[in-house]
């Protein structure tokens, strides 16, 4: 595939323009978002949050749908923000460039960093034992792990990565934009851990930014941490893709990339195949 020439910016940071799949298109049916409250958690006692379920027009209860879970619900589902996942779902499902998918957008509690930056299976367990069963009680979702994905940006990005790392039996496809790996309490465990551990059955889309937080610092460098994770994935032969942009620690470039990320994550080749 030949990519058209695009003049690169001289002054940074840069902002990126959204493509047509990030805008509401005439003639494309729009899915619905349904809001729910979750006020009694066993995994995170005393916390409260909301979550939303996106249901595409093409959904049929007789045909179990693919599942994709997003952290930081508002950042990902608000079509006036940068990411606009529901609009991208509408356009790509309509064109059959991704499967019919139930999207679950979960708010963090007031303990966002404690939940998202932890290096354990607690958040994955919260999703798998609390939120997702509630969703599946109302909507037909496939039990095929190859059709379950998880996504997030910033701390929500490393949260998504960690959930898939601990539970690859459930989450197989990962979207991680500007992951805050440096905020994990004991430091970023993944570069060493990925190299030391047999490869897991994961397909991972990573986005990093050259002007991310502390990009020119030897410590707590978001860009460096994401590149180190990507390098380890490459060395172990993972089914992964890395896109590096010239933006900052915001949702702009990651949001612009979302349609291409979805197309790549949901391509039909078995996980592990390029």
PLM regions: where:
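Non-catalytic cap/lid and distal C-terminal segments of serine-dependent acyl enzymes
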Residues: 1-274
């Amino acid at each position: 595939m030949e990519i058209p020439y695009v003049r690169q910016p001289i002054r940074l940071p840069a902002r990126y323009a959204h493509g047509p799949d990030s805008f509401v298109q005439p003639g494309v049916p729009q899915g619905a978002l349904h809001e729910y409250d979750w006020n009694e958690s066993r995994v995170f006692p005393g916390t409260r949050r909301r979550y939303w379920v996106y249901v595409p027009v093409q959904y049929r209860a007789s045909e179990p749908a693919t599942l994709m879970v997003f952290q930081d619900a508002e950042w990902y589902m608000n079509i006036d923000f940068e990411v606009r996942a529901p609009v991208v779902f509408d356009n790509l499902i309509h064109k059959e460039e991704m499967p019919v998918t139930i999207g679950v957008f979960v708010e963090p509690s007031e303990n966002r960093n404690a939940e998202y930056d932890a290096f354990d299976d607690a958040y994955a367990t919260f999703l798998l034992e609390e939120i997702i069963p509630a969703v599946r009680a109302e909507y037909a979702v496939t039990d095929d792990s190859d059709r379950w994905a998880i996504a997030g940006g910033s701390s929500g990005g490393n949260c998504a990565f960690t959930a898939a790392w601990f539970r690859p039996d459930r989450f197989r496809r990962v979207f991680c934009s500007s992951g805050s790996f440096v905020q994990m309490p004991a430091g970023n465990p993944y570069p060493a851990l990925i190299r030391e551990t047999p490869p897991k059955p994961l397909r991972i889309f990573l986005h990093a930014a050259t002007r991310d937080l502390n990009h020119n610092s030897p410590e707590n460098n978001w860009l460096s941490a994401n590149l180190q994770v990507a390098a380890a994935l490459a060395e172990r032969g993972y089914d992964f893709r890395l896109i590096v942009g010239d933006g900052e620690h915001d949702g702009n470039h990651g949001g612009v990339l979302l349609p291409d990320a979805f197309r790549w994550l949901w391509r039909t080749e078995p996980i592990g195949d390029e």
